[in-house]
Amino acid sequence: MTSLTLALDAMGGDHGPHVTVPAALRALKSHSSLKIILVGDKTEIDVYLRQAEQPLLSRIEVIHTDEVVSMSDRPVHALRTRKNSSMRLSIELVRDGRAAACVSAGNTGALMAMAKVLLKTLPGVDRPALVSCLPSVTQKPVYLLDLGANISCDSETLFQFAVMGSVLCEAVDKKSRPKVALLNVGTEEIKGNDQVQQAAQILQNTDQINYTGFIEGDEIYLGNVDVIVCDGFVGNITLKTSEGIAKLLVHQLKRGLTQGFFVRFLAKLIAPRIQAVLSQMNPDHYNGASLIGLRGIVVKSHGNADETAYLQAISLAVTEAQRRLPEMIKDRLESILLDINN
């Protein structure tokens, strides 16, 4: 790939440089043309760079700051007062063109507020959306948005989310005409509130979006559609509930496989298969939520992500930057609006 630079908020998340720096080094090993700017406390960062190979160090830059956005900071407070924080400086690197994308595991609300103010939304986009992919029984990812950036949305905003989600799926998975659905309380045309009903009407009349209709919550993981659209209130609860169920299933499976000698013996025989199933259910395997609809790329990692999970978020940022995701969304929106106006 051509040379690409990412900005990492090295201090963000529960583990800070203990996770972000080793993950950055692993990303550099995987992508020979990648450069990374680590933003944070240089003293702490250097601890994890001491044993790194020189060829990797030559592709790392450290920008020092000892200011951090805490998980308890309110978004408005962080925006007004944390002007030299590792999170803000990372986003500013994207704004100023020094980095193609930013990755942070820090305070989600603060990240969204800073990104929206510093990067601005694309033409035709009223609000950015937070989107991530979920597993499915067909082994293909399903994209769900919005995950909490916008608690309530009107029909036009839901329509914009559908367009952005469709373009994201095309860009990341190289999927032609992804299937898009609206999350609803039923699949019948009469079901749903006014916002969902009106969004459905707009999508039905938009040829450039492969809209398939409504989808219910029990169909999310079947893999029958590629993109599922809802407001941030519904999306966030759906995501958190899904993660909780995954943890419950993993716990119950592990508990069941340790009860009794014969069961433990069988568990050892099928251990590789069990591990593969557990891996598919692990939310860390799908770590990385994209804040789309902005003039730059911002990827949010889980705050408690380990090194491998954080690496997944970095890889997502690399892919979106390579595909020039903001430009793709901008072009598609312009094309759709042109069709509607004609």
Swiss-Prot record:
One of its GO terms (cellular component) is cytoplasm. Keywords: Cytoplasm, Lipid biosynthesis, Lipid metabolism, Phospholipid biosynthesis, Phospholipid metabolism, Transferase. It catalyses: a fatty acyl-[ACP] + phosphate = an acyl phosphate + holo-[ACP]. GO terms for molecular function: phosphate:acyl-[acyl carrier protein] acyltransferase activity. Its EC number is 2.3.1.274. Pathway: Lipid metabolism; phospholipid metabolism. It comes from the Bacteria. InterPro entries: FA_synthesis, Phospholipid_synth_PlsX-like. The keyword Lipid biosynthesis applies. It is found in: Cytoplasm. Its main location: cytoplasm. GO terms for biological process: fatty acid biosynthetic process; phospholipid biosynthetic process. Transmembrane segments: none annotated. Belongs to the PlsX family. Homodimer. Probably interacts with PlsY. Catalyzes the reversible formation of acyl-phosphate (acyl-PO(4)) from acyl-[acyl-carrier-protein] (acyl-ACP). This enzyme utilizes acyl-ACP as fatty acyl donor, but not acyl-CoA. This is Phosphate acyltransferase. It comes from Shewanella sp. (strain ANA-3).
